[in-house]
């Protein structure tokens, strides 16, 4: 079993560069199946989710070359076949293969997706969209087959999303890119990652308009070609390092940051009194003085991102006073709370809300990462704490934070990954 060991209490200083967006690349790689030529991605993060997606593409017959942060994928050999269930079941974003395989072959046979356990994340919206486009759904054991009649080309449709969903919006875009006719998505999600996927599709020859707004229109085309695409910076990784820098830094510059992707998050930091300077593509976070408590309520983009409430929680514990966190997106995103309490935090879950009272001096302790962003919170807490913190279940952390051990070590952290 692998663990992360942190000897905390050291102030961090220096520069850290944000990697490409995890939540983009896990959709971009399946999207490439739609291409009739080679596609190159630049800025690909070194995370286990990418490793798993590469393996899936290769098992299906595609060719992949990797050189550092550059990924070259030739999807022309990809076969119409059942997906490798083991990798699919461990990876929530595997559901993006539904849309891309439907668009290419008129059917997809896949295992049900896995990932972090954050409460209900039904794929009903995805399936409703596919059915509106002429597909039928069949359950076969632990797998699901989504298919048009006799593998015919999927049809364009007018689709209204009952709730705002990033995954369903992207999946519908993927299926619609090569559909017969026009697809309109109303009440679409607006996240930057959706714009990134639409940009790749358009560079491949698709006709997607309105990405980043509530209405997206896709005119289906018969074929897509190869291209080269730069993955956008990871706004969640950026926010995680910004919060970490405010909590335990004495001057840290976070590079490769797009401020416009983080406005609601940065507004909360400013309300706390966090001192920072926004540059063209970077944010410099100073060493902090006294901080004020704030209340946080997550909401779909451009609101406060659910993926940032856990990484920000340790910073909130430095504020003088009481505050609360309400996650309206994922109801079970509270599993970091008992772990922080084990480290001495005055924090608890009351009536579905996280209530904290600070400031708190944390102490090192053995803790367990229950999901990706909870793991990021525990890393920050370990850096803040007096003494040694041992984090287990770290595979979640490695799923989403590229080279996190090396990046923190370069800032002066006493952190290491060990095999037990």
Curated annotation (Swiss-Prot):
Its EC number is 2.5.1.7. One of its GO terms (molecular function) is UDP-N-acetylglucosamine 1-carboxyvinyltransferase activity. Phosphoenolpyruvate binds at residues 22-23. Its main location: cytoplasm. This is UDP-N-acetylglucosamine 1-carboxyvinyltransferase 2. Cell wall formation. Adds enolpyruvyl to UDP-N-acetylglucosamine. It comes from Streptococcus thermophilus (strain ATCC BAA-250 / LMG 18311). The modification 2-(S-cysteinyl)pyruvic acid O-phosphothioketal is found at residue 116. Belongs to the EPSP synthase family. MurA subfamily. InterPro entries: Enolpyruvate_Tfrase_dom, Enolpyruvate_Tfrase_sf, MurA_subfamily, RNA3'P_cycl/enolpyr_Trfase_a/b, UDP_GlcNAc_COvinyl_MurA. The keyword Transferase applies. The active site is at residue 116. Pfam families: EPSP_synthase (PF00275). The gene is murA2. It is found in: Cytoplasm. One of its GO terms (cellular component) is cytoplasm. Pathway: Cell wall biogenesis; peptidoglycan biosynthesis. Keywords: Cell cycle, Cell division, Cell shape, Cell wall biogenesis/degradation, Cytoplasm, Peptidoglycan synthesis, Pyruvate, Transferase. GO terms for biological process: cell division; cell wall organization; peptidoglycan biosynthetic process; regulation of cell shape; UDP-N-acetylgalactosamine biosynthetic process. It catalyses: phosphoenolpyruvate + UDP-N-acetyl-alpha-D-glucosamine = UDP-N-acetyl-3-O-(1-carboxyvinyl)-alpha-D-glucosamine + phosphate. UDP-N-acetyl-alpha-D-glucosamine binds at residues 92, 121-125, 307, 329.
């Amino acid at each position: 079993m692998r663990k992360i060991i942190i000897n905390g209490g050291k102030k961090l200083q220096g520069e850290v560069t944000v990697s490409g967006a995890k939540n983009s690349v896990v959709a971009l790689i399946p999207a490439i199946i739609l291409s009739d030529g080679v596609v190159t991605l630049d800025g690909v993060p070194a995370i286990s989710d990418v490793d798993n997606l590469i393996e899936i593409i290769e098992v299906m017959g595609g060719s992949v070359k990797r050189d550092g942060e550059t990924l070259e994928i030739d999807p022309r050999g990809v076969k119409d076949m059942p997906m490798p269930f083991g990798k699919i079941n461990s990876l929530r974003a595997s559901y993006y293969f539904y849309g891309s395989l439907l668009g290419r072959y008129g059917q997809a046979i896949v295992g049900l997706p896995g990932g972090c356990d954050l409460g209900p994340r039904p794929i009903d919206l995805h399936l409703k969209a596919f059915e509106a486009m002429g597909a039928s759904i069949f359950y076969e054991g632990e797998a699901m087959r989504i298919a048009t009649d006799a593998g015919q080309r999927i049809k364009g449709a007018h689709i209204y999303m009952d709730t705002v969903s990033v995954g369903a919006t992207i999946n519908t875009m993927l299926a619609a890119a090569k559909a017969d006719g026009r697809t309109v998505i109303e009440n679409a999600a607006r996240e930057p990652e959706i714009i990134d996927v639409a940009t790749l599709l358009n560079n491949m020859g698709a006709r997607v308009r309105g990405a980043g707004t509530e209405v997206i229109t896709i005119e289906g085309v018969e074929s897509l070609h190869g291209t080269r695409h730069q993955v956008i910076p990871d706004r969640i990784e950026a926010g995680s390092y910004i919060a970490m820098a405010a909590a335990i830094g004495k001057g840290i510059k976070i590079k490769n940051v797009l401020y416009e992707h983080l406005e609601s998050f940065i507004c909360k930091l400013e309300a706390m009194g966090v001192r920072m300077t926004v540059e063209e593509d970077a944010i410099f976070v100073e060493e902090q003085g006294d901080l004020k408590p704030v209340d946080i309520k997550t909401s779909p983009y451009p609101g406060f991102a659910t993926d940032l409430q856990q990484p920000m929680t340790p910073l909130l514990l430095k504020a003088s006073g009481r505050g609360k966190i309400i996650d309206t997106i994922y109801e079970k995103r509270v599993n970091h709370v008992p772990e922080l309490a084990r480290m001495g935090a005055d924090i608890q879950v009351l009536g579905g809300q996280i209530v904290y009272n600070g400031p708190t001096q944390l102490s090192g302790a053995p803790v367990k990462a229950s999901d990706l962003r909870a793991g990021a919170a525990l890393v920050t807490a370990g850096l803040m704490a007096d003494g040694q913190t041992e984090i287990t279940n770290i595979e979640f952390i490695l799923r989403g934070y590229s080279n996190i051990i090396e990046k923190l070590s370069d800032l002066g952290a006493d952190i290491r990954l060990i095999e037990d």
